[in-house]
Design a protein with these regions (language model features):
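Hydrophobic alpha-helical core bundles mediating ligand binding, dimerization, or RNAP-core interactions
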Residues: 18-23, 41, 45
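Conserved N-terminal entry element of GNAT/NAT acetyltransferase domains
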Residues: 1-13, 149-157
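Helix-loop element at the rim of GNAT/NAT acetyltransferase active sites that forms part
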Residues: 20-34
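Conserved active-site alpha-helix within GNAT-family acetyltransferase domains
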Residues: 94, 106, 119-137
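Acetyl-CoA-dependent GNAT
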Residues: 34-88
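Conserved acetyl-CoA pyrophosphate-binding loop and the N-cap/start of the following alpha-helix
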Residues: 87, 91-100
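Conserved beta-strand-loop-alpha-helix junction that forms the acyl-donor binding cleft
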Residues: 86, 114-125, 141-144
Length: 157
């Protein structure tokens, strides 16, 4: 059983946990901003209350926190997503991707999911490609990937 908890509803323990995860070397090595201080973290969480173009969720599986998924630059047509698993927890990437697709297509009602993947993050790129995301562009540091909802409907379950 998967449950999503909006970052705007986190308790103090969850806020601190996410702060630690966000700055963990295994996670922040694949983030544009490598380190944030706690005050910056709190300001970010506060801004989420007023910003409808961003949604961040803590992901629970059977009451255990397994990771974070997020949606940014949300429009009526598309959004960008991100994810990270609890440090040292293996095998939950597929669960997080499924929740991203489900939330984006069923709740946000977007047609296209997009992301930027660091070129040296081979593990993430492989996961996305296994889930039928395609590379539509690239720059010096990133692959630009996307998945259209129509492509999902054509896939076998």
């Amino acid at each position: 059983m998967i449950k999503l908890k909006n970052f705007t509803e986190l308790n103090s323990q969850e806020i601190e946990l996410i702060f630690k995860w966000r700055n963990h070397p295994d996670i922040n090595q694949f983030m544009k901003t490598k380190y944030i201080d706690f005050e910056e973290h709190l300001r970010f969480l506060k801004k989420l209350h007023q910003d409808s173009s961003k949604k961040y969720f803590l992901v629970f599986q059977y009451e255990q926190i397994i990771g974070v998924i997020d949606f940014v630059n949300i429009t009526t047509k598309s959004c960008e997503f991100g994810l990270y698993a609890k440090p040292n927890l293996k095998g939950v990437g597929q669960i997080l991707i499924q929740e991203i697709k489900k939330y984006a297509f069923e709740n946000l009602k977007v047609n296209t999911l997009k992301a930027y993947v660091f070129k040296d993050n081979r593990k993430a790129l492989k996961l996305y490609q296994q889930n039928h995301f395609t590379i539509y562009d690239e720059d010096k540091d990133f692959y630009h990937i996307c998945l259209k909802q129509s492509d999902c409907k054509a896939l076998p379950s």
